[in-house]
Amino acid sequence: MLMVNRRKISIIGAGHTGGTLAFILAQKELGDIVLIERQQSEGMAKGKALDILESGPIWGFDTSVHGSVNIEDIKDSDIVVMTAGIPRKSGMTREELVQTNEQIVRETALQIATYAPHSIIIVLTNPVDVMTYTAFKASGFPKERIIGQSGILDAARYRTFIAQELNVSVKDVNGFVLGGHGDTMLPLINNTHINGIPVKHLISEEKIDQIVERTRKGGAEIVALLGQGSAYYAPATAIYETIDAIFNDRKRLLPSIAYLEGEYGCSDICFGVPTIIGYQGIEKIIEVDMNNDEYQQLQHSAQAVSEVKNSLKFK
C-alpha cells in the first residue's frame, strides 16, 4: 500500500494570530495543521480547528486541522510556529513583554527539541528579536532552522503607507526593512522603488520621514486602535509567506530575523536582515550596501536589541 508522507505544521498558540494563520494555511493546503493551546484554553484550540474544518467544503480544501492541549501532538512536525505569549497591551513597550515571554519561549523551544527535533522553528512571539535568540539558545537547533519573522510584516506596512501616499498599487512598491522589530527598525529608503522609480523622486523627504516613523509605530498604532490585543491578519500572512517559501523551496529573498555571526558587523544576536528562504530554512544571509548613516542606524538598532537580550540570562 502506498503511504503518503504529508507535511505537518504545528502552531503553538491558538489566539488571533495562530488561528488566522491556521485558516490561511488550511486554504492553501500546505500541510496538516495542529493548533496547540494551554490546558485551560482547550476549547479555543479545538473550537477554532473545528470551525476551520467546517469551512473546508465551502472553500474547497481537504486540509486536516487538529486542536490540542498536548504538546506531544507536535511530534514529527516539519515546521513549528511559536505565537504563544502574553499579548501586548496599549501603552506597553515590547521590552516590557520580555520577562514573561522569555520563559514561555524557552520552555516551548525545549519541548520542540524533544518532539520535533528536525523541524524548522518560526518565532512570532514579542519582542521577537530576543525571543528568536531565546528559541535558538534553548532548542540547540542549527541557526538556519530558527527564523524570527517581523521584516515581512514591517516591509508590508512600509509599502502600504507608500502606496497610500502615491495612490498606486502596493504591488508596484518594493522596499526592505532591516533591524530590530520596533522603534529602531531601518527601512532602506535608498533601496525603495515604485516599479523601478526611486521613491525619493516621487515623495518629499519630509513625507518619507513621516512614513518611516509610522512604519516604526505600526504595531502600536494597531494596538491603540483595537484597544485590546494586537495585529494578527498581517502577521499571520507574513508567516504564511515564510512557510510557503520553505515548503516550495522558492529561494525567496525575504527579510527575516536570523542569528548573525559577523554579518553587518553584528555577532551573537538575532536581528532582521535580508535572507534567502528555501527548504533548509535560512539558506543565506544577504549583506547589502548602505551608506554610513544607514549603517550607523543599523548599529543603533542592534545595540537596542542587544540591551534587551543582555537583560536575560542564557546558558
UniProtKB/Swiss-Prot annotation:
Keywords: NAD, Oxidoreductase, Tricarboxylic acid cycle. It catalyses: (S)-malate + NAD(+) = oxaloacetate + NADH + H(+). NAD(+) binds at residues 13-18, 101, 124-126. One of its GO terms (molecular function) is L-lactate dehydrogenase activity. The active site is at residue 181. One of its GO terms (biological process) is tricarboxylic acid cycle. SUPFAM superfamilies: LDH C-terminal domain-like, NAD(P)-binding Rossmann-fold domains. It is an enzyme of class 1 (oxidoreductase). InterPro entries: L-lactate/malate_DH (IPR001557), Lactate/malate_DH_C (IPR022383), Lactate/malate_DH_N (IPR001236), Lactate_DH/Glyco_Ohase_4_C (IPR015955), Malate_DH_type3 (IPR011275), NAD(P)-bd_dom_sf (IPR036291). Pfam families: Ldh_1_C, Ldh_1_N. Gene3D superfamilies: Lactate dehydrogenase/glycoside hydrolase, family 4, C-terminal, NAD(P)-binding Rossmann-like Domain. Substrate binds at residues 88, 94, 126, 157. Its EC number is 1.1.1.37. Catalyzes the reversible oxidation of malate to oxaloacetate. PANTHER family: L-2-HYDROXYCARBOXYLATE DEHYDROGENASE (NAD(P)(+)) (PTHR43128), L-LACTATE DEHYDROGENASE (PTHR43128:SF16). Belongs to the LDH/MDH superfamily. MDH type 3 family. This is Malate dehydrogenase. It comes from Staphylococcus epidermidis (strain ATCC 12228 / FDA PCI 1200).
